[in-house]
Amino acid sequence: MQLKKEISLLNGVSLIVGNMIGSGIFVSPKGVLIYSASYGLSLVIWAIGGIFSVVGALCYAELGTTITKSGASYAYILESFGGFIAFIRLWTSLLIIEPTSQAVIAITFANYLVQPLFPTCEPPYSASRLIAAACICLLTFINSAYVKWGTRVQDVFTYAKVLALIVIIITGIVKLCQGFTINFEDSFQGSSRDPGGIALALYSALFSYSGWDTLNFVTEEIKNPERNLPLSIAISMPIVTIIYILTNVAYYAVLDMSAILASDAVAVTFADHTLGVMSWTIPIAVALSCYGGLNSSIIAASRLFFVGAREGHLPDALSMIHIERFTPVPALLFNCAMALIYLTVEDVFQLINYYSFSYWFFVGLSIAGQIYLRWKEPDRPRPLKLSLVYPIIFCLCVVFLVAVPLYSDTLNTLIGIAIALSGVPVYFLGIHLPESKRPPIITKLLSAITRFTQFTCFYVLTEMDTVD
C-alpha cells in the first residue's frame, strides 16, 4: 500500500501560499525596515528576497520531478549524499525545527484569538497554551481522518488570509490615491550602507518567504507531479512576492517609520488607523493565517517523519498508513506529541534562534546535491531541467546566509550546530550498528510497538515508492 495521490494543482498552490504567508507579514515586517533604515531600500530587499526564493523553489521543482519521493530536502540529501547526512537533517527537524515552529505558530494563533477578551493586558499563559494545544490536536485529527479534509482546510484558510491582505493592499492604494505619499518622497534617504545591516535585513525578508518547499514534502501524494509540482511553484511564488511588496507599500502609505518600529503587530496598528470599527477583523485574520500555516506545517512534517521511518531512520511504526483512509496517522500523532511537548517550554520562542543556520545549510546542501547529480547521473530522466546557473547562484547565496548567523548570533548558532551533531551517536548506535549488536531491549520494544500498531489500529507498512 502507498499514500494516495489526492493533492491537485489548486491544493498545491494553497499549501505553498498558506505556509509561506504566516503571521510574519501581519505582525513583524519591521525587521527588514529596522536594518535597511529606509522605505525604498526595504522594498528593494523584499523584492530581492522574493527573487531569491523563486530561484530556490525552481531548483526544488527540478529536484521534486527528478526524485519523486516525499520528504523534500531529506529525500534529496539521502539520494545525493547518503544516509548519514540525511539522518542529521531529519534529526534536526525532529528535535527542534518542526516542533518549535508549530508550537510558536499555535501560541501566536491562541494569543490573537483571545486578545479581544483581554484588550489591556497579555492573555493568560495557561489559556493561550491550552488553546494552542487544542488547535494542534484538532488539526492532527483532521489530517488523520482524510487527506482531503486537510487540503480543504488549507484551501479555506489560504483564501481567508489572502483576502485579508488584499483588504490591506486596497486600503493602502486608496490612501495613496488620496495623496498620502509623503513617506515615498526621497524614499531612499537614510538607507543603511552597512553590509552587515543589509545582510540582516535580507535575512529577515527570507524568513518571511520560508515555506516554498512545502509541496516537496508531499510529492508522492500529488496528482501528476511532473506537471503540478513545478506549476504550483510557478503560480505560488509570484503571488506571494507581489502580495508581500504591495502589503508593505500599504503599510508605508499609512504609518510612519516610528509607528512601524514601535508596533508589536503592524497590521493591527494599520487597521486601527484605517478600518475604524472594523479594525477587529485584522487580529482575527492573523489568527486564521496562523491556523492555515500550522495546518500546512503539520502536513509537511508528518510526511517527513513518515519518509524517514520508511527509509529506516525512525521506528517502522511511523511509516504506517491507515488501511482505509490512506493517511500516515502514526507520523501525524508523533508530530502532534512533539509539538505538545514543546508547548510546555515557557520560552519556546527562544528556540527559534537555534535553527536558522541548520535550515539554510540543509536547503543549500539539497541544491548542491542537484549539481552533484547532474555530474554523477547526467542521463537520468529530468522532466524539468534548469540551467546550472540557477543552483550555482543559489548555493553561493546560501554560503552567505549560513555565514550571517555565525557572525551576528554566534552563540545561538553554535547551540543549533550542537543540537544537530547530537544526532551523530544516535545514528551510529541506532542505525549504522548492525541490529544484532544493538541493545536487545530496544529491538524488542520497537518490534512490540510495530505489532501493536498494526493489530490494534488498522495500520500497515507502506511500500517504497521507487518510481522516478
From Swiss-Prot:
InterPro entries referenced in this protein's UniProt entry, alphabetically: AA/rel_permease1, AminoAcid_Transporter
Residue ranges of the TM segments: 7-27, 41-61, 77-97, 130-150, 162-182, 198-218, 229-249, 274-294, 326-346, 348-368, 386-406, 414-434
GO BP: amino acid transmembrane transport; glycine betaine transport; L-arginine transmembrane transport; neutral amino acid transport; nitric oxide biosynthetic process
Pfam families (UniProt xref): AA_permease_2 (PF13520)
Endoplasmic reticulum among keywords: no
Extracellular-facing ranges: 28-40, 98-129, 183-197, 250-273, 347, 407-413
UniProt subcellular location: Cell membrane
Main subcellular location: membrane
Catalytic activity: L-lysine(out) + L-arginine(in) = L-lysine(in) + L-arginine(out); L-leucine(out) + L-arginine(in) + Na(+)(out) = L-leucine(in) + L-arginine(out) + Na(+)(in); L-glutamine(out) + L-arginine(in) + Na(+)(out) = L-glutamine(in) + L-arginine(out) + Na(+)(in); L-histidine(out) + L-arginine(in) + Na(+)(out) = L-histidine(in) + L-arginine(out) + Na(+)(in)
Keyword Cell inner membrane attributed: no
Ranges of the Cytoplasmic topological domain: 1-6, 62-76, 151-161, 219-228, 295-325, 369-385, 435-468
Membrane topology: Multi-pass membrane protein
CC per GO annotation: plasma membrane
Gene3D superfamilies associated with the record: Amino acid/polyamine transporter I
A single GO molecular function term of this UniProt record: L-arginine transmembrane transporter activity
Annotated family: Belongs to the amino acid-polyamine-organocation (APC) superfamily. L-type amino acid transporter (LAT) (TC 2.A.3.8) family.
The protein's assembly and partners: Disulfide-linked heterodimer with the amino acid transport protein SLC3A2/4F2hc.
Entry function: Heterodimer with SLC3A2, that functions as an antiporter which operates as an efflux route by exporting cationic amino acids such as L-arginine from inside the cells in exchange with neutral amino acids like L-leucine, L-glutamine and isoleucine, plus sodium ions and may participate in nitric oxide synthesis. Also exchanges L-arginine with L-lysine in a sodium-independent manner. The transport mechanism is electroneutral and operates with a stoichiometry of 1:1.
Protein name in UniProt: Y+L amino acid transporter 2
Gene source species: Danio rerio (Zebrafish)
